[in-house]
Amino acid sequence: MAKMEDIVSLCKRRGFIYPGSDVYGGMAGTWDFGPMGVALKRKIMDAWWNYWVESREDIYGVDAAIIMNPRTWVASGHTATFSDPLVECGECHGRFRADKIADGITESVTTEEFKALNVKCPTCGKTNWGDIRQFNMMFSTHVGPVNDDSSIAYLRPETAQGIFTNYKNVVDSIYPDLPFGLAQQGKAFRNEISPRDFILRDRECSQMEIEYFVAPATWEENFEKLLEQNHKFLTEVMGLKSENIHDIEVGEKDRAHYSKRTVDIMFDYPNGQEELMGLAYRTDFDLMNIQRESGKNMEYIVKGSTERFIPHVIEPSIGVERLILAVLANAYRQEENRIVLALPEELAPYRFCVSPLLKNKPELVAKAREVYEILRNKYKNVTWDDSGNIGKRYLKQDEIGTPKCVVIDFDTLEDGTVTVRDRDTTEQIRVKPEEI
């Protein structure tokens, strides 16, 4: 597998991902997507939406506000429990997330347990640590013209609560049959103590989450179905190799406060095995808390009967940036004379690149433009490249991940055929433009 620094270099060189605010020296934990990165990100998010929402009858979309009534985060438990263990070095005063700088410990590690490990500071190498304290990761802001305690609000740390707060609206307006899901894509913000590993752990990210509402007695069968369907999405739609995907059953001590069962779907990233996505059985935790905090009835009445209950919830949740990094790592290939980003055709920023063999020959350029317009009208995501020689163009498109390069040469002027060169095999064939 590729090294992380190789992927980072490719992403900046070819316009996928840049450091956030790069012109001002950057800002830790923030990243900007360039032209190729935006195209890849959009295709990944669209593929997820098509797989989970547009291709199914039981999942519906919502798009909730980023800034919500702060009571939302009281009911969800985030104001009390959304925290990570922070430890500060007594020598250099560097601050770190305790469970990420030592092996074999969890988020619940105590000061005594941590100090007994004699962990060296990643910055100065000393072992003079202060006490561990819990650091709440929500970004706070103020709503309105007065900055006081009454105006405090938060940037959402997850998209899930926007789904839960709209559960009653959806049931009252379209009354879907159980089981049903509500899906959302959008930004989430987490004030990470130690953002690291490129886009794997950052302070601003995009999430894709589903809250799947089920009758309490059916949660186990629905959990297994969703687990299988998520694996299918990752391997068949995203093209990830199954041998790099692993299910980890999360123990009770390490589960989120709302979960009775969690499976972390792990991926073999360049820096090691990390969480790609999670599947959590949230029981009725969220709807019960909303009912208590809001005073609104969250019960679901089964159609055609008097049976009523608060549904239980199963949540598939995936970070878009984590998925993008998995797709990039899966596709990156270093060969003797070139680097190839072997993206699935449906995810590649461009499907075709059209070029004249020589850009100083007007007749070739004119014919190439004609072919370009034909393919662009047919496929949309087609690019034009006449920079440098043809060999350099091939290498550039290989790194971008373009599956096919179409070249117009002097034979095209004679017989109307063009050269189509395959990214993965480098094989070339001649066909008529209308046959592409």
Each predicted region: which residue ranges?
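NTP/phosphate- and nucleic-acid-binding module
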Residues: 1-436
